[in-house]
Amino acid sequence: FNRHVILRANATPADMADWMNEAHAVCEQCEHFIPVAAASNSRNENGELVFGMNDAGGVLATWPGTLGIAAAVKGYRIDLVDKFAATVRREWNACGLRKGYMYMADTMTDPRWQRTYGTFGEDPALISEIMTHIIPGIQGSAQGVTADGVAVTTKHFPGGGARENGFDPQYAAGQWTVYATPGSLETYHLPPFAAAVKAGTA
C-alpha cells in the first residue's frame, strides 16, 4: 500500500479533504497505522492550469505567480510573503495536504530557461529574503513543521537556473551548467539555498 503520493488533480478543497480522510481510514485498518503523506506542487498562485507545472488553477486562494509576488515584495514590503504563506498553510492543512514541492530558490540567470515563471527572479538577496519568510510561514515555525504546518521541499538546486541554452536541468539536455562570470555560483546561486536551509526547509 503506497503511503506517499503526489496529488496532480485539480480537485476542490472538499474533494481533497474527503479523499485524504478515506485514505487515512484505509490506513487505520492496516496492522501498523502509517498515515498517507500527500504532496503537491504549489497551488496558490497563477490561475492558469498547466499539468506538472501549476497543479491547480483557481481552486484555492489565487495569488500572482512567484515573479509577481517578488515584484510586489520589491515594490511594497516583505510582510506580503508572510500573508501569502499563512494562506497556503491554512488552506493546505484544511485539505489534508501536508507536503509541498515548493518554492523555487533557483536564481534565474538565463532568461531562456523555461522554468523562469516559477522563480522569484534574478536577485539573490531578494530570493533569500523571501525564503527566510515563506518557509517558516508555511511550515508554521522557523524550528520546523508544526502540527498545522505543511512541510516545504525547496526546489531545485544551486545552479539550476543557469543551464546551457536555457534547457531544464531535469532532463539530459540540461545537464551542463554555464556560469557567465567567475564566482557566479557563490554570488548568485548558493545564497538563496543557504537561506532556505537556515529557514528550516524540509
What are these regions, as identified by a protein language model?
Residues 1-202:
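Glycoside hydrolase catalytic-domain context in secreted enzymes
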